[in-house]
């Protein structure tokens, strides 16, 4: 194993352990179950990033874990009959929402590298079927850098606050290009940097698991998408999410604020970012 491969596996291990604990304990990336993002506040997080009450009410209990930083299904323009892939599907939140959009003739596949999350999501399938009458979702174990998905087999890829966790983001974008059919679409919500974070923050394990330490500049995301062959790339900043977390006095964000330069705000450094792109037809 090379030094780079070792570093990547270390990141995967930390993220897998962190999200495994979240799945078992019912917390969120922001902290344990009693923190701002756990329990009832998960609905507040979802509302703040654009999910409507009807979507949330139709979800199986526990699928919404407060792990969102945007609403990728809102920009995905999902159509009946499409095959959708969710990168880092967690408890199945966006998979179940997308399933209602694509209907009985469509299919939604969630990929996650954390066995505890997969177990939680698969248990939720039963309730999803009862609520919707649909049998159109599945969950697979795998890393988003090495997707267990066939070439040219997916119409749309969605992802919600996950790509920042990857230690090899260019490879994630190459994998997205590989599995998408020609003309396929990407609709991603993630966190992005507005300026570089202080080293003390980028070294924090909880900041990595909390989707902060692994974030990159928006222009870097655009460049990775271009190099992977995507076109019609659109980046849209959504700063309200970071401001909302600051107002909710999230414990992780409070700790990060303590390590920022005096007088700085979290929203000076990081933003929620929507990314849409298309794979060329030829």
Task: Give residue spans per PLM region.
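Short, glycine-/aromatic-enriched active-site segment of Class I SAM-dependent methyltransferases
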Residues: 192-212
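C-terminal lobe and adjacent flexible extensions of AdoMet/dcAdoMet transferase-like proteins
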Residues: 2, 226-282
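Hydrophobic beta-strand segment of the Class I
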Residues: 84, 157-158
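Short alpha-helix
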Residues: 213-229
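N-terminal auxiliary segments of SAM/dcSAM-dependent transferases
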Residues: 2-45
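Class I SAM-dependent methyltransferase SAM/SAH-binding core
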Residues: 79-146
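A short glycine-rich, Lys/Arg-flanked "PGG" loop and its adjoining helix->strand segment in the class I
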Residues: 170-185
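Conserved alpha-helix/loop element of class I SAM-dependent methyltransferases that forms part
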Residues: 39-83, 94-101
């Amino acid at each position: 194993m090379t030094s780079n491969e070792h570093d990547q596996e270390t990141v995967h291990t930390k993220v897998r352990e962190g999200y495994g604990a979240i799945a078992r304990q019912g917390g969120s990336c922001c902290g344990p179950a009693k923190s701002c993002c756990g329990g009832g506040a998960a609905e507040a997080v979802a509302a703040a990033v654009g999910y409507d009450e009807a979507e949330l009410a139709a979800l199986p209990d526990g699928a919404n874990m407060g792990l969102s930083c945007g609403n990728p299904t809102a920009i995905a323009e999902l159509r009946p009959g499409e095959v959708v892939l969710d990168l880092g599907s967690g408890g199945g939140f966006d998979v179940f929402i997308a399933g209602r959009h694509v209907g009985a003739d469509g299919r939604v596949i969630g990929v996650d590298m954390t066995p505890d999350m997969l177990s939680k999501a698969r248990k939720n399938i039963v309730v999803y079927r009862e609520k919707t009458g649909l049998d159109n979702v599945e969950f697979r174990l795998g890393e988003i850098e090495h997707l267990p998905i066939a070439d040219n087999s997916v119409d749309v890829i969605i992802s919600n606050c996950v790509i920042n966790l990857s230690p090899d983001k260019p490879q994630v974008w190459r994998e997205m290009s590989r599995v998408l059919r020609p003309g396929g679409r990407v609709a991603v919500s993630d966190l992005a940097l507005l300026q570089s974070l202080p080293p003390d923050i980028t070294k924090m394990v909880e900041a990595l698991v909390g989707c902060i330490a692994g974030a990159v500049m928006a222009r870097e995301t655009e460049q990775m998408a271009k190099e992977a062959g995507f076109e019609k790339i659109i980046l849209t900043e959504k700063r309200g999410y970071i401001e909302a977390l600051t107002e909710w006095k999230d414990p992780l964000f409070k700790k990060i604020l303590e390590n920022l330069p005096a007088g700085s705000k979290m929203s000076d450094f990081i933003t929620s970012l929507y990314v849409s792109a298309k794979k060329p037809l030829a």
